[in-house]
Amino acid sequence: MPVNRSFSPFFPARRAVLQVAAATALAAACSLLATGPALAQARHHATLAMVAEPQTLDPMVSTADLVGTIMQHVYEPLYTFDAKWNVVPMLAEGLPKVSADGLSYAITLRRGVMLHSGRELHADDVVASLQRWIEMSPRGKAVGKEVASIQAKGALGVDIVLKAPYAPLLSQLALPSGMATIMAKESIALPLTSFVGTGPYRFKERKPDQYVLLTRFDKYSARKEPANGYGGKREALIEELRFVPVPNANTRVEGALAGQYDYADLLPVEALSRLEKSGGKTVPILTPSFGFPYLVFNTKEGVLANQALRQAVQTAMGPGEML
């Protein structure tokens, strides 16, 4: 299984959250996990207790963390983030060559990346995927307003031309929710019925309200750089991943303590002391940052339509008060 943040929620947050897993390999740098020695070495399968049944397995259409947490094992983007939130290449060979006017991005793909269907990834797959993302993804639609064209240049080249300079382009392509996933062009449909990506796991089966089953992709084309955040080398240490919906947080806690789950997502912080006293069955990891706190003002009507008042509120309520 990918060791680089495989099961973490996608965004670091500003409040403490708890998770628990049975393996160091499952631990990621977001929220609280409890990991134990059982999964620290390669093994055949793992059961992962998630907060709900995913509404869809289409990571473009949904911005839900749950969907991305599962399907980031199946699909990969052109770019992603390292541990310091710098944009780094994933399916792209390197960062793009940007024209002097900031309008043209020339992207070269890694050679020999295998799709789950058994053939190599080509530029046509990337173009078709990005066009679908622009049409279907909430994030992609916003980016699409800035894009003049997306074209393949040979087997491994992709050119994105913008209408005007757009600084967030690479970050938007790297975001792991509503993500710009790259898929085999022949699998593209709405809704998706075939999940053909390049990730370290391939989709095997979904039984609604029971599980989503992923199996290791033995021909996975990993990057050579060391794992770093979402970037770098990803390794599938476990043969099968079974994601099960367990909406009740207390059930996730008890299941983790009983050894029923190898990983349990988003547990109440109040469970920390029990997990710490589990006799080595679980190893909790607490991250005090989880989520993005922000204020939203109604600028159309009411007292906060006044910009000076909004600035006063912003000054009075600094980041410390929001945390």
Task: Enumerate the predicted regions with their spans.
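A structural "hinge/loop" feature
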Residues: A52-G68, L91-E93, R119, P168-G178, ...
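N-terminal export leaders
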Residues: R14-L18
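N-terminal lobe/hinge region of extracytoplasmic solute-binding protein
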Residues: A49-A100, Q131
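Surface-exposed binding/hinge segments that line
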Residues: Q41, T108, A142-M183, P191-K207
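Aromatic- and charge-enriched surface segment that lines or borders ligand/interaction sites
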Residues: G94-R139, K153, D159, G255, ...
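Aromatic-rich, solvent-exposed beta-strand/loop patch
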Residues: H116, V161-G178, V196-N248, L272-G291
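Alpha-helical secondary-structure segments
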Residues: T47, H122-S129, A155-G157, G199-P200, ...
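Extracellular/periplasmic solute-recognition and catalytic clefts
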Residues: S149-Q151, K204-L213, V244-E301, Q311-A312, ...
